[in-house]
Amino acid sequence: FPDDAVKWRRVATSIHDNFEVFFDPQKGAYRKGFLLKEDGSLAFDNTLDVSSAFGVVMFAGKEFGAEKTLKSIEAIESTLLDKSPSGGLPRYEKDDYFASDPPHMGNPWFVATLWLVQYYVRTQQIDKAKHYVDWMIDKALPSGVWSEQINPSTGEPLSVAPLVWSHAEFINTALDISHAQQPKKP
């Protein structure tokens, strides 16, 4: 598999070297995606998507604190966060997967909300992070499990429950908060 490692390294370097293409200056946020067309040009999907910012927060290194990352988070907060009576964060604008209430931008997803919470932890906004951890605990089913997403108007669970992904991100987030609150060693 050494050839695969070389290919992956080459692709990672290409992504890093072309990082600017991932940002939509008009929207002020990272793009949801793009498609390389047969003629070599790019077709962009400029939908506001929390996973695009999460990828930068988790994997981009020096771009983490960059102005474009901050703008992306601000766009997500102002456009998507807590825009329904149930609170939380849909994955992206006009997400219609299990769409239950079309007037809203999409159904709140626990995973998407926790990705933003992990950004808050990394930027030492612990009170804000804890607010959404409490929100998630409040939305658990009586058995203590979480679904994939919730109805934006009623807060009722939608899609599969339990969803291991929701639980895994909750554990990751709890560990991140715990680590962030540990006294720093001199």
Which residue stretches match the model-derived regions?
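Short coil/turn segments at secondary-structure junctions
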Residues: 3, 100, 154-157
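Extended ligand-binding clefts on enzyme/binding-domain cores
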Residues: 5-111, 123
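C-terminal capping/lid segments that line or modulate ligand- or cofactor-binding pockets
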Residues: 41-67, 108-186
